[in-house]
Design a protein with these regions (language model features):
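A conserved beta-strand-loop-helix scaffold within acyl/acetyltransferase catalytic domains
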Residues: 57-59, 68-75, 79-98, 102-106
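Conserved acetyl-CoA pyrophosphate-binding loop and the N-cap/start of the following alpha-helix
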Residues: 110, 114-122
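Conserved beta-strand-loop-alpha-helix junction that forms the acyl-donor binding cleft
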Residues: 111, 137-147
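Conserved GNAT acetyl-CoA-binding A-motif
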Residues: 127-139
Length: 151
């Protein structure tokens, strides 16, 4: 049986509304310092395995380093205490004054706690500080069942 993958392209152009993070107690979202590409690769593999994230699985260490050290890329990490919970990556495109939400996800053991929407809200708030023309994301029917409604 062949099933079609539905793709969705979404954008935000109005950043005037304040976004409520609803960050639970003992959770924090930190901006990664780009020292360690292993963190991005870990999240990509662990979260992506359930959603058919495949394009970066064959990347070499040097490809990961080049990606993570891009001066316009930010990786934000959600933690509970010292435990890793989830992340998102966003890239600022200065030529078009846009922010692209590249990847976002929560580790399996933390799903069902509405932390994905917390990360989305944080990403919007973070992007808005750059005063972009728009923020955009694409998702598809292979992503988490709540991804589209969260965006």
């Amino acid at each position: 049986m062949v099933s079609r993958v539905k793709r969705y392209f979404l954008e935000i152009k109005d950043f005037s509304k304040t976004v409520d993070l609803n960050l639970p107690e003992n959770f924090q979202i930190i901006l990664d310092d780009k020292d360690n590409f292993h963190l991005n690769r870990f999240f990509y593999k662990q979260i992506g395995v359930d959603h058919y994230w495949r394009d970066r699985l064959l990347w070499s260490d040097s490809e990961w380093v080049k990606y993570v050290t891009n001066k316009n890329l930010e990786t934000h990490v959600l933690k509970k205490g010292e435990d890793l919970v989830g992340y998102y990556e966003q890239e600022y495109h200065p030529g078009s004054n846009e922010v692209e939400l590249i990847n976002l996800g929560v580790l399996k053991e933390f799903r069902g706690l509405k932390l994905g929407s917390t990360l989305v809200n944080h990403a919007i708030a973070s992007a808005s500080r750059k005063n972009p023309r728009r923020m955009w994301v694409h998702t598809c029917s292979l992503d988490h069942k709540h991804a589209l409604q969260n965006y």
